[in-house]
């Protein structure tokens, strides 16, 4: 189990970075609301957020043959603020918003929570693309840079191939997957949709997908392999025998700055989990962890990363530093100073 006794410094980082859990509890006090989805003019200038109800938005999408972009957020959610001040203000996203019906849902309202329950929303921010017929196409994760976000969005809008269909193809007819399908699977928000995969899906599926696309799309391959490691780690508690995975693909990722940026969310938020399933002896694992944390710290000020993701560059260092310590040591003064400057 992770044992991070990081005091006030890491509490600040966690406040800025942790994906927010939705308050889908009907007993909690809710703010006043209207029956309409209100226009949020300050949440992204130039985006024509739909002003009617969700049902009206789906009816309009069907009539106009336009897909739907549905966003759940909350004013108190730091990652949501990052999305609003980066993605929603980018000229690319504003231009793309003319291609779909954009819906903004304030997660603190009872109506939004009801819609969230209907579509299985597990946390904030959540962004889902629906086809004009109302079928869910994909869920886009937070924690990726703006250029990648916009390219994934545009690709999903172009193909409108539902992720659940792609999963079935991956399981049964992988030769029928398109290049864009691999990228959609690689950038799907798996952690926010527990039903996208059939129950009991073997994590090895993602390793196999990573191998298939390794030459034509190294970034998608890297993300798919890291998803394999995350799923492998998640299933270890239930497994009778503990499985170990090849560390070579991760080593190659950590040696390529562009791949590090492209897999930043995995490398930052799942460091402990991924490291726990690598087939390495203690010395080799320590070397890889050193390479991992140094690579993230070296790139944390990359301009393509949001402020929150730049701060997340500290997670591997902090996680490896404190992991397993019954009585955690004090962080070096130089690192405390650096974290404070970044925050």
Question: Model-found features: residue ranges?
Answer:
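A short beta-strand-turn-helix
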Residues: 49-67
